[in-house]
């Protein structure tokens, strides 16, 4: 089996980012983004997706977190697209429900080659630890556009905003793990009747 690893660098006037991933990892993670709450959520992706993930970012945090969060989503999406390659033999679809105390979220993903995001999370607060929760929409939109996936995110219940967000990211990691897993029964075939994705 070919290694499913990728490293991507993105440099703009707003951010300088390096992302390295191993889709067949064990959940090892290292983050240096300057945004601690974002690091905490990236750790959920790594641990629950069993994806080795290394993210470094120097961003214009003196303005706010927006460019850093969005550009990390973009760069992570690019790394996924590069690491997964032609998608032959993958399960393609992934889904997960994850609870955390009173909160419950569902994430469904399709490595379809068609970017689309439906995110329905009725946050009960505007920020957590000074982090603007609206920025998670920017993160996921960047990821979706560059990984070329369809992603549905629903927080089904919850009143603690931290719990709402954490269940979303844990479910996202688990849905990714399912979708990118190689299916031996596919025998390297494309998971589409079209013959391509």
Swiss-Prot record:
Amino-acid biosynthesis keyword on record: yes
Q: Which parts of the chain are coiled coil? A: none
Query: Which reaction(s) are listed as its catalytic activity?
Result: D-erythro-1-(imidazol-4-yl)glycerol 3-phosphate = 3-(imidazol-4-yl)-2-oxopropyl phosphate + H2O
Q: Which family does it belong to?
A: Belongs to the imidazoleglycerol-phosphate dehydratase family.
What high-level taxonomic lineage is stated for the organism?
Answer: Bacteria, Pseudomonadati, Pseudomonadota, Gammaproteobacteria, Pseudomonadales
Which terms does the UniProt entry file under GO BP? L-histidine biosynthetic process
Q: Which Gene3D superfamilies match?
A: Imidazole glycerol phosphate dehydratase, domain 1
Keywords assigned by UniProt? Answer: Amino-acid biosynthesis, Cytoplasm, Histidine biosynthesis, Lyase
Q: Where in the cell is it found?
A: Cytoplasm
Protein name, as recorded: Imidazoleglycerol-phosphate dehydratase
- Source organism: Pseudomonas aeruginosa (strain ATCC 15692 / DSM 22644 / CIP 104116 / JCM 14847 / LMG 12228 / 1C / PRS 101 / PAO1)
Q: List the disulfide bonds.
A: none
Cellular component terms per the entry's GO annotation: cytoplasm
Which InterPro entries would you find in this protein's record?
A: IGPD_sf (IPR038494), ImidazoleglycerolP_deHydtase (IPR000807), ImidazoleglycerP_deHydtase_CS (IPR020565), Ribosomal_Su5_D2-typ_SF (IPR020568)
Q: CDD domains from the xrefs? A: IGPD
Q: Name one GO molecular function term.
A: imidazoleglycerol-phosphate dehydratase activity
Query: What's its EC?
Result: 4.2.1.19
Pathway it acts in?
Amino-acid biosynthesis; L-histidine biosynthesis; L-histidine from 5-phospho-alpha-D-ribose 1-diphosphate: step 6/9
Write one Pfam family the protein is assigned to.
IGPD
